[in-house]
Structure formats: C-alpha cells, structure tokens
Amino acid sequence: MTTINYNENINNNNNTLESFGIEEWLINNLKEQSIINLFPVQQEIVPFINRTEGHDICVCAPTGSGKTLAYAIPLVQKIVKRVVRRVRVAVIVPTHDLVIQVEKTFQSIIKGTDLVVLSLGVKPFHIEQKLLIKNHSYGEHALYESLVDIIVSTPGRIVDHINETLGFTLKYLNYLVIDEADRLLRQSFQDWLEIVIDSTNQHSDLNQQQEEQLIKYNSKGDIELFEKSISLKDNNNQMNHLCWSEFKLVKLLLSATMTYNPSKISLLQLNAPLFFTTSKTKEIKYSMPSTLKECYIISNGDQKPLVLLNIIYESLLKNNANGENKKKIICFTKSVDITHRLNTLLKLIGQVDKLKFTCEEYSSSLSTVERADLLSRFKLNQIDILICSDIMSRGMDIQDIDVVINYNTPPNITLYVHRVGRTARAGNFGVSYTIVDKSEIKYYISMMKKAERSQTLHCLKWKPNVYEKFQSSYKLGLNQMRLIYSKRKINDIGDNGDDNNDNNNEDGNEIDGSVENIENNNNNNNNNNKNNNNNNFEKDYEVKLKHSLLEISKKKAKINFNI
C-alpha cells in the first residue's frame, strides 16, 4: 500500500479541463456553473479515476477543497454509456442536508444525459420506493426494473431499502463512495457498512500468496507498478484487504480527517487501496487550507457573549467601512440548547454599536425543509449570522462564508477541523475564531499541538474597555431574555397546577421556537387558562410574575443562562 502525496498549492490552474480527460458535454455543464479550472485535489483524483481500474481510493484533503466534484466528474463519465439502467453509483453521507447537497452536484453535471440520480432519506419512504423500482411482475414471476443510476443516501436509509424495498439491489454496483468517512466508520455506523458490503455480493477469497502491487508516478506523470511478492499467512485476515484481487466494486473514501485504524478499514475490504493526501503524512496529521487565518481569544465564562459581540462588530465594521456586503458568519456551539438560547439573546440585542445584524438558529430541532430554507436565505445575504449546533460542521458547502466562530471550544481536533473548514473554501480567504475559557486553555493548546498542524495560531488579546460599548445592549437583551423565560416558566406552572415540574427550565433546557413564537404561545396559554379558571388566572399570573422577577433580581437569575 502506497501513500501518494501531493502539494495543496500545486499551481496547475493553467491546464484546461480537456487536459484532465473530461469529455466535451461534461465540460459544457461545468462551464455553465462557471467552473473553468480544477482545484488541486480534483486535478489529482479526476484523471486517476478516469484511467485506473481495480483500485480503491482514500482521499484526505481539507474541507472546501472540492472533494465532491473530484469523484462526481469521473464517476458520471464512467457510467454515462451504460446500456441497462442499474444502481451503479452509491454515495453515502452522514446527514440529510449533505444528501441534498451532493444530489444537486450530480444533477448539475448530468444535464443532457439520460442518467438518473435520486436522493434517499429526504422524501417519504413509500415515494422513494416508487422512484427506485418499477414492478413488472406477473403471476409468480418477479421482474423489477431499476429507475435510477446513482443514489445518494444516509446509512440508515439505504439499509431500510435493502431490507424492505422489493427489487432493490446493489449487486450491480460499480462504485461505493463513503463521504465524511471518518464519521461514518465510527462504531455506531458499523452495522450499515456490513449490510451494504454484503449486499454487493462482491466478496472473494484471497490466496495465501498474492502479488502486492505498489503504485507511484514517474517523472512524466504516468503510473508505474512495482510488484512485490508477500505472504499473508502470518498477517491474519485484517491485512488481506490491502492486497490486489480481481474485484468489481470500487470504493472511494473521502474526509478531511481520515482514520488509519486497521480494524475499521478492514471492514471495507479495500482492494489495493491508494491514499491521496495534501501533504506528507509524517509531517502533518490534519490539513487546513492555507487561506485560513486561525485565531483564539481567552475569556472568562461570563464574558463570552461580549467577546462574541466584539467579533461580530469587528467583522461587520470592516465590511461596512469598505462598502462591501456584510460578511457571512457561522457561530458553532456545543449543544442545541445553547444554540437556541444564544440565538434568542442575539435576536434581542439586534445590533452592535448601531450596526444592525440578523441571526437565525440552525440545529437538529428544525426540520430538513426549515434548514434548507435557512441556508437559501443565508446564501442570499438575508441572514448575517447562523448560530449552529454541530449538524452543520460537516460537508455543508457554502462558498462565501467569511467567518467561523467556535463559541464553545471543540472537544477534539476532528470536530475543530470540520467546524473551521466551513470557511476558506475553494481557494477563498477566511477567518476562524475560537473563544477559549481560561479553564480550557491548556487543553486547547495541547490539542492543537498534538494535531501537528502547519498553520500559525493567532492569540488575540483585547483590553477590557473594548467591551464597554456592548455592555448596555447586552444587559438589556439578557434582562429581556430572563423575562421571556420567566413568563414561560409561570405558564408551565399554570398549565401543570404546581411548582414541582419546572426544575428542567431552571437548568436551561431547550425551549422550542423563536422569541416571537414563545410570546405567541404565552398569549394562547393565557387565553386558555383564563377560560378554564373563570378569569382568575390573569391576576394570579401577575402575582407570580412579580414574585419570579423579584427572585431573579435577588439571586441574580435563578434560571441558569449558561451561554
């Protein structure tokens, strides 16, 4: 097994699309999307897949480097001349949002062909079944026709169709793509992998003695094979997957942080795999775009919202001074609950030193349709800031995100890489900020050092008076937020008839809906309770509200606003 390394900064942009073996009809489709050059990872992967058979491929490259098109272009070109329609390409991704995104990429490059691509996991199951398979059965004879060539799916959904959709099969599959491979190879996803591999019926026994073929490029860029006889007798079955065999199915693994755990990779039964990476593996473990500037700010816990406001202010102020559009900002938190509460607070504040901004919550508490709508508005500059849980940390491709903020320090380097990788994509410049609590600084620095990264980390030190301009608006927003949560708490008391069921709210658990929805719900609850309690609830409500606000002022927020 040979690792093929290439430099991320290879400057081959003068090469034409034709020079990479891309056919004219496909070039026209790419040019319609203003794609006239390939990025480095695409320059390596596209021609390699076009001219190579029988090798599985693992690609470890930074987020935003163009990995999706790197495999979509050659795979479409490989199957476009098929005669009988079968499921020949299956792309597995971890989230529904990524399913939609990858499907759109395929749709954009298959124009003018009769290829059909279908996303699984987005539509109702019974509708997907009708779009996948046509039943021509008569009597006791079962005859099924595949209606698609390419499927893009989450792991669970493809397993559902394997088990429950009559006529659906992967035995004709030519290419299995596992995007965000490091996440999908985690233990919780192992069952789907075995089911999918088994369903391809591509298993074959390896002989005890085989020829391992090592591959590298010569000075002319041609592939050279170096044969080396090896014995597998003492290496157990875990090493069998690394050797050459006659194998129909080709597997492609892609991620910004690729695992090298043999026990996990062995489940894939890789065939003579080749590893593509952006730099020498011995020198760097986690590759980041060279166009990304990484910063961190050390802060006290209660100061974090003010640090966030200053980052927003600095980002908006620079663009405003230059007469440019507002920067697109993504702010990551560690939970859905904090995402909701931070979004509520920022909505109430609404501006930083007279610079207005708009923000929305993007988390798993929203439906797929709602998240898609938010992304569309974000792309159209109708939203300045998305407050996100980690649902958006992987794979979501929005080209012009300028700033990524880690409101909470990521617990591991893998998550950090995927978060900050939302900016500085496709050769654009971007900035990331990580707000590090004083108690976490040693862990954070240690984590970044162990990652053996090549980029410089910039520590920003802001004087306390920098935050003074935000103090009044922050306090006002926080007080309004406490009032809203207090009203919600009292409504819950009124609904439940006692004080024993409100402990969860004091811990800051998630409250559904925006600030406006909360207030509307309060009004509806008030009307219902008035009728049910013979118009006595309003007076009781006012008494409880005054009591609650008094307790808040005395104890400095009985409700925990740990944001």
From Swiss-Prot:
Gene3D superfamilies: P-loop containing nucleotide triphosphate hydrolases
Stored InterPro entries: DEAD/DEAH_box_helicase_dom, Helicase_ATP-bd, Helicase_C-like, P-loop_NTPase, RNA-helicase_DEAD-box_CS
Residue ranges of domain Helicase ATP-binding in the record: 48-276
Keyword field: ATP-binding, Helicase, Hydrolase, Nucleotide-binding, Nucleus, Ribosome biogenesis, RNA-binding, rRNA processing
Motif DEAD box in this chain: 179-182
EC number assigned by the record: 3.6.4.13
SMART domains, sorted: DEXDc, HELICc
Sequence motif Q motif, location on chain: 15-43
Residue ranges occupied by any Helicase C-terminal domain in the UniProt entry: 308-482
Low complexity bias (residue ranges): 520-536
Region (Disordered): 493-537
GO cellular component: nucleolus; nucleus
Primary location class: nucleus
Family matches, as CDD domains: DEADc_DDX51, SF2_C_DEAD
Pfam families registered for this protein in UniProt: DEAD, Helicase_C
Family: Belongs to the DEAD box helicase family. DDX51/DBP6 subfamily.
Domain text: The Q motif is unique to and characteristic of the DEAD box family of RNA helicases and controls ATP binding and hydrolysis.
UniProt-recorded name of the protein: Probable ATP-dependent RNA helicase ddx51
Gene name of the encoded protein: ddx51
